[in-house]
Swiss-Prot record:
Lineage: Eukaryota, Viridiplantae, Streptophyta, Embryophyta, Tracheophyta
A Pfam entry, by short name: Chalcone
Known role: Fatty-acid-binding protein. Interacts with most fatty acids tested and has maximal relative affinity for C16:0.
Compartments, as annotated in UniProt: Plastid, Chloroplast stroma
Family label: Belongs to the chalcone isomerase family.
InterPro entries: Chalcone_isomerase, Chalcone_isomerase_3-sand, Chalcone_isomerase_bundle_sf, Chalcone_isomerase_sf
Name of the protein described by the UniProt record: Fatty-acid-binding protein 3, chloroplastic
Name of the encoding gene: FAP3
Gene ablation phenotype (knockout): Embryo lethal.
Length: 287
């Protein structure tokens, strides 16, 4: 409890003292004409009270205000530590999540957003958060001490992350209404050119992927999880709001899963802000 109280901003405490002091002042201001000695508290809503009763009521009320403010402030401090905000879209991502199909919790490594250009106007479509199993970081010691710029330009680091035999996931949160077919067409437009000679396995995987979004409205707040279980298998989960709890489909194609990873972390990522954020976090972590 002491730690929680210590975390309450001083401005809140000052505000609390001022609020209770104002109750004292209010007692000398709010009274009935001709009966200046019979003061009535501004807290009173219908019944007269004595000055003694009024004092007790005021003290109890101030105590209740104190408890509520402390509880609220402590809760806000705790909640703020549990989330990271993607500032361009104001979407908040949990720092640690347990996702469907994953064997252990994943940790947030970076956030960004996807912007689509219409003529010269950029329209934000979704925010994205990238999560990894923390065991992946132990395999990146070769990049210890590198700057964020060096990490971002080094494609071999991101290849190492993709090839690591541990789960990683991309959480996409729509910030505007999008038709499912439109979303898939944009994704397929980025994936297909990265697969030079699609095999029957690739074609089947792309068909499965497409089927998830056909005739499916993706309203603002919808969440899509793209979870790489390994280099050849990826889970896709969709919900209309909040983290999905079930797996909608499994994509079984190494070419498709690697192409999708390259869409976000290759040399020409669809969300430069996401890749930059991940690089910055890695630079701070790999020290």
């Amino acid at each position: 409890m002491d730690g929680i109280l210590a975390a309450v901003p001083s401005a809140v405490c000052v505000s609390l003292r001022i609020s209770c002091r104002n109750l004292d002042n209010a007692e000398s201001i709010y009274h009935f004409p001709g009966k200046s000695l019979n003061r009535v508290s501004v807290l009173q809503t219908g019944n007269y009270v004595s000055r003694k009763g009024n004092s007790l009521l005021k003290n109890r009320h101030c105590g209740e205000i104190s408890r509520v403010i402390v509880k609220s402030a402590a809760s806000s401090v705790g909640n703020a530590e549990d989330y990271a905000e993607e500032t361009a879209t104001s979407v908040k991502f949990k720092r640690s999540v347990t996702l469907p199909g994953c064997s252990s919790p994943l940790s947030l490594l970076g956030t960004g957003f996807r912007e689509k250009k219409f003529a010269i106007i950029g329209v934000k479509v979704y925010a994205a958060g990238y999560y990894v199993n923390e065991s992946i970081l132990s395999g990146l010691s070769a990049w210890t001490g590198r700057s964020a710029d060096e990490i971002q330009r080094d494609s071999s680091l991101f290849v190492s992350i993709f090839q690591a035999q541990a789960e990683k996931s991309l959480q996409i949160v729509l910030v505007r209404d999008v038709d499912g077919k439109t979303f898939w067409d944009a994704l397929d437009e980025a994936i297909s050119p990265r697969i030079k000679s699609p095999s029957s396995e690739d074609t089947t995987a792309l068909s499965t992927f497409r089927g998830i979004f056909q005739n499916r409205p993706l309203n603002k707040g919808s969440v899509i999880l793209l979870t790489w279980i390994n280099t050849s298998n990826m889970l896709v989960s969709v919900s209309s709001g909040g983290l999905p709890t079930n797996v909608d489909a499994t994509i079984e194609s190494g070419n498709v899963t690697s192409a999708l990873f390259d869409v976000f972390f290759g040399d020409s990522p669809v969300s430069p802000t996401l890749k930059s954020s991940v690089a910055n976090q890695l630079a701070m972590t790999l020290v």
